[in-house]
């Protein structure tokens, strides 16, 4: 029953993003999840207690503001936990994973309790104070990404360096773009790419755990002018069209395109360095 509730909440949250110009950002009434910039931001508000007349009125006002700020921050933390639970990890929500593993749940709750303040405190017209808190997805990934199944750190650079260095700079491929603008794809922290024969083209075994945590396997953007494109895949990426996204999280490309990516990986180490980006609607 719990899993059904989480799935429903995740579905409702994604509805906020469907018509948004930035569908890599899932917005709710309590904040947003930004898969492109790998950050989760929550917001909390609280009423400012009316000023009381007193000989020491100034100190009373300071005390009241302090209480209101504390209440707003507490609400923002509660909202943050709710947002974290609907983050799409790999087709599973973080909340589903927490429900299955009490240790993971405790670690994530600790992470949420250490969320940092995002921006300045806002003082609203209706006598309210608002505070935003943020958690980086790298912190969430540190907890959720398994230690096993990834490329060994020691061999992650050795296989392609000679080939890349012997290729003229003008001919080097700098990254891979998967164009998913014609299909429905839900962003995730660790999605995979398969070909039409259901063979894995890109997944944890292609990159190290540290890169998965710190960089994320894939970037997201909505057009080629987005600054994330240059930062993630450089100036000369190859562009591959996604065929489908049957489970809405993992992407499928053609067999021919999967061979092109494998060849580019052997020569330039694009997958090893997580130089992969998905274009969304």
Give a label for each model feature.
Residues 1-5:
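Positively charged n-region of N-terminal signal peptides that target proteins for export
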Residues 17-281:
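Domain-level marker for long, solvent-exposed, non-transmembrane regions
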Residues 9-17:
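Hydrophobic h-region of N-terminal signal peptides that target proteins for export
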């Amino acid at each position: 029953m719990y899993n059904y509730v989480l799935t429903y909440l995740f579905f409702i949250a994604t509805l906020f993003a469907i018509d948004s110009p930035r569908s890599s950002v899932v917005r709710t009434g309590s904040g947003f999840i930004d898969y492109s910039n790998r950050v989760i931001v929550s917001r909390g508000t609280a009423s400012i207690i009316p000023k009381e007349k007193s000989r020491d009125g100034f100190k009373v006002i300071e005390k009241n503001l302090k209480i209101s700020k504390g209440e707003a921050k507490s609400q923002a933390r509660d909202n943050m936990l709710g947002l974290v639970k609907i983050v799409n990890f790999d087709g599973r929500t973080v909340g589903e994973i927490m429900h299955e593993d009490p240790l993971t749940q405790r670690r994530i709750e600790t992470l949420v309790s250490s969320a940092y303040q995002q921006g300045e405190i806002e003082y609203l017209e209706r006598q309210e104070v608002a505070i935003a808190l943020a958690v980086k997805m790298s912190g969430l990934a540190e907890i959720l990404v398994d230690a096993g199944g990834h490329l060994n750190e020691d061999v992650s650079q050795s296989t392609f360096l000679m080939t890349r260095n012997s290729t003229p700079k003008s001919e080097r491929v700098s990254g891979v773009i998967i164009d998913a603008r014609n299909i429905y794809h839900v962003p995730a922290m660790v999605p995979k790419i398969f070909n039409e024969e259901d063979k894995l083209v890109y997944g944890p075994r292609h990159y190290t755990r540290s890169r998965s945590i710190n960089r994320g396997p894939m970037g997201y953007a909505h057009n080629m002018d987005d600054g994330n494109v240059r930062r993630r895949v450089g100036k000369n990426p190859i562009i591959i069209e996604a065929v489908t996204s049957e489970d809405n999280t993992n992407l499928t490309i053609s067999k021919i395109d999967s061979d092109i990516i494998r060849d580019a990986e052997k020569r330039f180490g694009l997958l090893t360095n997580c130089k992969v980006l998905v274009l969304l609607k």
